[in-house]
Every structure is written in C-alpha cells, then in structure tokens.
C-alpha cells in the first residue's frame, strides 16, 4: 500500500517546500523505496501555461506535455522517477473536473459542494498521481501543498488531505510542516512565535504536524527547538533545523543527519535498507572544487526573476560540474542590447545562451546577440526562441532576405522565416489545429517528440542518430524557407520524424566552432548526475574558448 507524506508551509511563501520535499524524496529513494512527488497548487488557473514568468517563474514541461509548476523540475533533478501530468494539479483543474462531472449528471442531482465533492476530487487526483491501484504504484508519495496555511485558497486541499489521512490510518500517512523563524537583529535572537501560530492554525483545521522543518538564516539552537516542541506538540526530535546553504544539494544530508527520514520511516512503519547519500556528498564536493571558471551571458527578457530560467540555470551548473568548471551566469536584459553596442556588452563572455520566451519585447536585442556570436565565433546556444532569432538573423544578414522575421513579431514581414504552424500531430497521434485566434492555454506543441539527426553534424556528435526532447512553442521554422537558408550555408541538423519540422540548426564547423539553435527545451532533462549532452558540449566549448583567450587552463 502506498504511504503518504503531506508537506505544508506556514508564515510566508517561498521557504523552499519544493527543495525540502525533493530532498526528503531523495533520502527515501536512497533507502531503496520507490518514491514520487505530487504538487498541489491553489490558484484557479488550470495550469501555469499562460501565467507570466515574473509571477510564477518557469513553466516546467513533462514528457507527456503537461505545463507544470517549476517544483516538478526540482523533483526530476533530485529523484529517478519521471513526472507526468498527474503529478501537478491546481484548484482550476479540480473545479474544471467537478463541473464537467456535474454537467454529465455524475452527481445524480445532488447539490455540488466543496465538501464532499471538491475534497473527494482532490483525493482522487492525489491517488491518481501516486498510481494507486495500478502497476506503477509507489511505496511513498510526497504531496506538497502549495500556498501558506491560513490562506483561503489552500483550505480545500488541507481539508482533503486531513480526510485522506483519517481514512488511511495513522501509520499510512504523516504530516511535515515547513515554517520560518525570523532573526531579529536588534534583539539578537530567533523568534519562535510565528511558528507557534502557524502550527496552531494547522491544528485548528484538524492537522497535527509530526515534524517541523524550521527555516532560518542560521542553525536553530537546542533551546529554541525545545521551546518550539513544547508549544507545538511536536516531539523535540521532530523539530528539524533547515538553515540557509549555498548549494541546494546539501539539503538531503542536512535533513538525514537530523533524523528526518528515520522519523518518517518509523511513523509509516517502513522497513528499508540503510540510507546512502554518498553520491550527494560527491556532488557537493564536485560543486565546491572546480578546476576553473567560465562566464556565460544568458540574454533574455525575464532576467529580473532568475526562477524564470530555473532549469536553464541548473543545466548550465550541471554541465559545469561535468567539465570541472564553475559556471558564472550573467543574466542580460535583451532590451538593453542593439547592434551598435553588442561588442561592448558581450565581448568579455566565454559563451552566449539565448533562452525561450514569448512576445516581441527584446527580440531585436536577441537578434543582435546572435549576430555578434556568429560573427565573432563565440559559442552560442539558442533554445526555442533562441533558435528562431538565430534563424532570423542568418536570413537577414547572410541569406540576403531583407527584413526577414517571425510572424509572431511582424505579421506583414516579406520573409516569414518563422511562422505559425496550423496543423500538427500530438505525441498520442491526435491531430491538433490552431490559428492566430486559438486559445493560448494548451495550444502549443508540447511534450517529448523525436527527431532524426543529420550525420556528420555537431548535433550528431552530441546526440547520435535520434534525439527525443521536450517542446513548448507555437511558432516553427517555415519549411518554405529551408532551401534558401541551406543554400546560404545554414545546416538543418535535425527534423521531426512525423511532420519534418526543423528541430536543430547549426553553423558548419568551417564557419564557426560551436553554434547551435534547438527548437526544443533540453534543460528539462538535465540532471546533476549526468548533466545533459547538449549543455555539456556547450560548456566544453566555452571552456575551450576561455583557455584560448587566456592561454592557460580555465
């Protein structure tokens, strides 16, 4: 039978429930348990696909094409289990499902209410995410409830998991509550009162935490832990200190050394092998002992919030570990770059990356960036929109297609080298159609799709014959312009197996040492253990350029 760990949060948001949940999952996985994670988001959006990155951070895409919370990226980077659309759902998704059932008459004329209909639906979604009753059922499902205890939006989720825990029995579920202890500099002490109040709020709705993860900017002394235990009815060994660390991969060791996994296994009566976190220790050591450094300019439009590019940032760091260098990432606002000052802004970097994005703002700065990288032989990786701007730049300045553009930015362009594809086939074989007036939510090419890679290319050296990567985009390279671009020297290095859509473009090695644009999002499949072959190669090229410029090791 699947056991459940419910993770809640209090006092303030952004305490790191996702990292804490993923770290606990990693520890339990090291004990030989099959683990998954489920994220419950209290907002009314059906999914985060149409939300601004400035509000929500990046949208993480799964193999099956779900647009999900960025915490699922943490989950996949910390454990072996791959996420899918069942691992993340929102209030909007729940209400959508309930209303569809009501319209079908599934409730047999009853008055549809939050209790029991909405709370029952939440429980069904949780069980589905854990694979209960199926061959893919897991030993432990860690359920992270978004938001903060006390928020009205989270109440149906908290009530649902309270009911679920009661029904399952004491040894089949447990509650872990993440809280915050502020340091008051003028008083010179940590304050426990907010933690006391948030646990009290949790108890008011019928939930007693079995463990408290106490976030602070420093270790919590034993005296404060004893005080918290007394006022929250949590045993002192269940009051876990979670202080700020410089590397998130230190968190599993931190939690294990304070006995969190032992407490969970005892509560759930799980007999496991001993914990082995050696690979996490090795990972931290590799991170802390690089043999050099490279600096990468990430030129985008959402640079004011680094979480907008969370997976890209992590993929670059993973590749740094594989190449034994520390990767310094400078986020550069593309609106601040034009052709006249590109050299002044970009010359000092070892490599340039242009990530995905939507909308016209900052696009000309990205095009200028791609041109500078091409003309100055600076390693360039363009992801999604980054591939499209590289294609536009090449069309304008090499292929002689004046004013070439994407119809996303200029519907009247004389040379729409990037355009909206109106019909395509999903991973499940179903035909999808869209146009300029289609709904924005859920209408993109999404999820994992396979492409054939052209032999003899840089992409082939990196990937081999076939590449399978995740997608999230609405516009494509226009097939009508592929031949003129090829004749001008642009290499179309990979095409989708079904629709023959452009997936990878690159410059020939005779023209540029490392210049690749990809329509997909490779960052979603990078892990700290292996990195990702494309990012690994990109950082290797950055390292080689750094060594050539400085005539010594990076």
UniProtKB/Swiss-Prot annotation:
Activity control summary: Allosterically activated by GTP, when glutamine is the substrate; GTP has no effect on the reaction when ammonia is the substrate. The allosteric effector GTP functions by stabilizing the protein conformation that binds the tetrahedral intermediate(s) formed during glutamine hydrolysis. Inhibited by the product CTP, via allosteric rather than competitive inhibition.
UniProt binding sites for L-glutamine: 357, 385-388, 408, 474
Gene this protein is translated from: pyrG
InterPro entries membership: Class_I_gatase-like, CTP_synthase, CTP_synthase_N, GATASE, GATase1_CTP_Synthase, P-loop_NTPase
Pfam entry (one): GATase
Binding positions (ATP): 14-19, 71
Protein name, per record: CTP synthase
EC number(s) recorded for this UniProt protein: 6.3.4.2
Binding site for UTP: 13, 191-196, 227
Source domain of life: Bacteria
Record function comment: Catalyzes the ATP-dependent amination of UTP to CTP with either L-glutamine or ammonia as the source of nitrogen. Regulates intracellular CTP levels through interactions with the four ribonucleotide triphosphates.
The protein's annotated pathway: Pyrimidine metabolism; CTP biosynthesis via de novo pathway; CTP from UDP: step 2/2
Disulphide-bonded residues: none
Positions of the Glutamine amidotransferase type-1 domain: 295-548
Residues at which Mg(2+) binds: 71, 144
Keywords: ATP-binding, Glutamine amidotransferase, Ligase, Magnesium, Metal-binding, Nucleotide-binding, Pyrimidine biosynthesis
Residues annotated as signal peptide: none
Record GO cellular component, one term: cytosol
Family: Belongs to the CTP synthase family.
Catalytic residues (positions): 384, 521, 523
Annotated segments matching region Amidoligase domain: 1-270
BP-aspect Gene Ontology terms: 'de novo' CTP biosynthetic process; pyrimidine nucleobase biosynthetic process
Description of how the protein assembles with itself and partners: Homotetramer.
GO molecular function: ATP binding; CTP synthase activity; glutaminase activity; identical protein binding; metal ion binding
Reactions this protein catalyses: UTP + L-glutamine + ATP + H2O = CTP + L-glutamate + ADP + phosphate + 2 H(+); L-glutamine + H2O = L-glutamate + NH4(+); UTP + NH4(+) + ATP = CTP + ADP + phosphate + 2 H(+)
């Amino acid at each position: 039978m699947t056991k459940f760990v419910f993770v809640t949060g209090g006092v303030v948001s952004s305490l790191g429930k996702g990292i804490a949940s993923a770290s606990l999952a990693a520890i339990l996985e090291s004990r030989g348990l099959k683990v998954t994670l489920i994220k419950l988001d209290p907002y009314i959006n059906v999914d985060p696909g149409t939300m601004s990155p400035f509000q929500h951070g990046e949208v993480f895409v799964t193999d099956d094409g779900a647009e999900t919370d960025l915490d699922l990226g943490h989950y996949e980077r910390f454990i072996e289990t791959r996420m899918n659309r069942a691992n993340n759902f929102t209030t909007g998704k729940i209400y959508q499902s309930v209303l569809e059932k009501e319209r079908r008459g599934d409730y047999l004329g009853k008055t549809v209410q939050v209790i029991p209909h909405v709370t029952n639906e939440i429980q069904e979604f949780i069980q589905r995410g854990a694979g209960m009753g199926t061959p893919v059922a897991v030993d432990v499902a860690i359920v992270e409830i978004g938001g903060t205890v006390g928020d009205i939006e989270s109440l149906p989720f908290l009530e649902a998991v309270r009911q679920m825990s009661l029904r399952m029995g004491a040894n089949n579920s447990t509650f872990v509550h993440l809280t915050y202890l502020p340091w008051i500099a003028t008083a010179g002490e940590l304050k426990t009162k907010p933690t006391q109040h948030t646990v009290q709020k949790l108890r008011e709705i019928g939930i007693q935490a079995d463990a408290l993860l106490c976030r602070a900017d420093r270790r919590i002394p034993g005296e404060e832990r004893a005080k918290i235990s007394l006022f929250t009815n949590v045993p002192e060994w269940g009051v876990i200190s979670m202080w700020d660390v410089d590397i998130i991969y230190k968190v599993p060791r931190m939690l294990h050394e304070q006995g969190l996994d032992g407490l969970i296994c005892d509560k759930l009566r799980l007999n496991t092998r001993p914990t082995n976190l050696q690979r996490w220790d090795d990972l931290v050591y590799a991170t802390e002992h690089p043999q050099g450094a490279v600096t990468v300019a990430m030129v985008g439009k959402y640079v004011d919030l680094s979480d907008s590019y969370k997976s890209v940032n992590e993929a670059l760091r993973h590749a740094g570990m594989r190449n034994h260098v520390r990767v310094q990432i400078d986020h550069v606002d593309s609106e601040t770059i034009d052709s006249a000052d590109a050299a002044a802004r970009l010359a000092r970097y070892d490599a340039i990356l242009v990530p995905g994005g939507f909308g016209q703002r900052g696009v000309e700065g990205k095009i200028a960036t791609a041109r500078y990288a091409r003309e100055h032989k600076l390693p360039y990786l363009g992801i999604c929109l980054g591939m499209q701007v590289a294609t536009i730049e090449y069309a304008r300045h090499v292929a002689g297609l004046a004013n070439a553009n994407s119809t996303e930015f200029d519907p009247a362009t004389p040379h729409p080298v990037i355009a909206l594809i109106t019909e395509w086939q999903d991973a499940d074989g179903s035909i999808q159609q869209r146009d300029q007036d289609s709904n924005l939510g859920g209408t993109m090419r999404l999820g994992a799709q396979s492409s054939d890679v052209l032999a003899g290319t840089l992409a082939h050296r990196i990937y081999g014959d076939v590449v399978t990567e995740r997608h999230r985009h609405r516009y494509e390279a226009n097939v009508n312009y592929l031949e003129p671009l090829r004749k001008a020297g642009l290499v179309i290095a990979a095409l989708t197996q079904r629709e023959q859509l452009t997936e990878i473009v690159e410059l020939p090695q005779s023209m540029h040492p490392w210049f690749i644009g990809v329509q997909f999002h490779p960052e979603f499949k990078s892990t700290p253990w292996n990195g990702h072959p494309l990012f690994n190669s990109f950082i290797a090229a950055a390292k080689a350029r750094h060594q050539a410029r400085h005539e010594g090791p990076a």
